[in-house]
């Protein structure tokens, strides 16, 4: 497969969602304590009530802004109280509503410094051409907070820890933070980009990305196995079976999102898939 074939395949898959995003809406819900799901069936968006304003992790597709605003209202929150949006990486399907929040409410926007620099260097980096119905005037947002590898950032009573995981983009963020419900504190974790089309040779060469990226990703994925995670969050629902877990919760009760083996399972699977790409593409580590 080449880049153009992959682009056409993706646009075909996404065309129905872009025409009728309301068909992909789901009711927002609490995951644990101050952590909520406000995304849709195509992309994950998480809301954290920090006690001193709200934080969003990603803001979804540009054609589904209304679904996000509606979900925030339905939970009893106000979109104007979103202080910060943390972006897992620099692809268009994760910053769709961010400019709206910044312009209307003064929300600060955060992303890794690495991806911010790539977006500035090459506007195509954000894959806006992959959006079947993106308005021509739609541009990547400006970012006020640039995150470094290993950095901590505190908002209200929540401290977010960031690890850089180059691969899906050079500046993908893994995000870890504690959430409390009653006397119980759990660790939430999210790996902000697990799709591997972006580490195939055709994609790397299309955007002038280093061929070392698959090896960089493999090294960091292995290192992340040391992180303890009680609640594995996805940045697309398939990453952690968001929709299946919610359906199970509605039928059986309990909290299927709390499962400390999910994180290790994700990383084991991802490690194997990265090695498959390296072998398939005959990449050689320098």
Where would I find each of the regions flagged by the language model?
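N-terminal non-globular leader segments, chiefly Sec-dependent signal peptides
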Residues: 1-13
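Divalent metal-coordination and catalytic microenvironments
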Residues: 34, 48, 58, 68, ...
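Active-site-proximal beta-strand/loop segments in catalytic clefts of secreted hydrolases
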Residues: 40-41, 59-60, 88-90, 112-114, ...
